[in-house]
């Protein structure tokens, strides 16, 4: 009887309200506009989303974007204690590696040759805010994730990326759009060493997961898409509004729930916040110079630099680091 009663409860009792149709249509359009060669979004196409994020008073958990081919959707909001220009200085400089500013989520990333952002980034970084006219650029990004907090899996994939910098009622707003054109590589086993907040991760080339009874599973990210709006709040801070969809699992099944996506966004933003809000954060130019220096080192020098870290890892015996795959 209890099961029957639960089954006939109105859908509104268990689901968040849908977004207004103009907002959904605008999100759909932006995701379709992400690949290079597509028409640039007109300012009017962005207005429904900007109207919504600046006027919405509902808690993020009470807002639910419609499901898409890329999976279930969530809405999430964060506020960063720094102006948009400073965020852009790190996010839109191709010389700054993603792993330096998103350490909790990105193992490594790179813009592929031919990406518009490789030649356009300077226009964004030096633009007057808000800009007199919208600025648009695109690119194709290669990305590898850090190990998942549950399964230990990490993935690699390509993303179509779209950036639009615009003026909204005298406030600068940056749209960051991503859409995965195909599924990811098969999930490989990694592990988090100690507390995830320490950003210490190890990686193997072994397929599978760290989950009990599911070590054999060959998992994939089947779909991923996002529309993020960064907008100045008028007090020197920047609001970030995330619309995110994801689908992942094995043998074609999807095991991702909205709560998993929200947890992933919180993990992503926690790393970004700690790096960017820290008074000790180096400038984009300093990070780029250090990264270039690392790339110029030979293998022997890199191994020497990493020897203390390797010794630290060798002293760890927590599961699953005692397994052969993590000791090679």
Describe these PLM feature segments.
Residues 15-328:
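Terminal "cap-and-tail" regions of soluble proteins that handle hydrophobic small molecules
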